[in-house]
Amino acid sequence: MKKSILIAALGLFSLSTMAQDAKPEEGFVFTTVKENPITSIKNQNRSSTCWSFSTLGFVESELLRLGKGEYDLAEMFVVHKTMQDRGANYVRYHGDSSFSPGGSFYDVMYCIKNYGIVPQEVMPGIMYGDTLPVHNELDAVASGYINAIAKGKLSKLTPVWKKGLCSIYDTYLGKCPESFTYKGKEYTPKTFAESLGINPDDYISLTSFTHHPFYTQMNIEIQDNWRNGLSYNLPLMEFMSVIDNAVNNGYTVAWGSDVSETGFTRDGIAVMPDADRGAELTGSDMARWTGLTAADKRKELTSRPLPEITVTQEMRQTAFDNWET
């Protein structure tokens, strides 16, 4: 069975770019080396559901690659189903696990395999008058409810507490449909998923850490991997080579990373700037550089091509071990 890459797991990374020579004021200029078909970028807005948006974007690109046509799949169907399972897990551990709106790519593939999927038009996932997701209130309400159940020192739970949690997500996201009509055909979420021809078991997760043996599967120890999904552990250079090979052969890759890193921007740029050399090369004297806010430093370091850190296996591991990424 051929396997496709699903995710490259959380950690430090460097993104090599084919940048043309440009004056500093011109910012980044890229040469397209390889372009694989994708669907339009969707806006998660004020929701911590990047994992659902990005993975379904990957699935949509796979459908294009397989000649299935263009689809817009419902992110909030996945969020709804995932948070029901996560709530049940949280209560089973008496609150000594993670219940948060974050997630992993494995959650999406698990949902497709076990619950199916629906088109976006069938479940837009916004029941409160906005056009884009705003989950501040939803997250607060769901957290308060589930903690009252999991940590409420109740002698016995009622048989309906799961319905209460489900009703919260029904209220904000809409109910997950049991059946629906799409382009003149009747489906359930499961039969619609089957019609797409995407088999979640055909996709694998890759990562690269030294605290587990290479060439074995490992559970990445982060809170959002609460389902304990496994990833194949490869040496860093092999890990990157596999990704390059996939892209060059027409596959897209879903990459899980840390948006708190200095080199992450919301402009489609991700770099690993060398802060010390960057300050020197942008002409900033020490007084000015030290006077910049963290946000200003970040903007300056990611606004134009600058020297980048070459990330090693050891650097990646140290950052992970120290909660830096």
Which sequence ranges carry the predicted segments?
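Catalytic-core signature of thiol
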Residues: 21-325
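Bacterial Sec-dependent N-terminal signal peptides
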Residues: 1-22
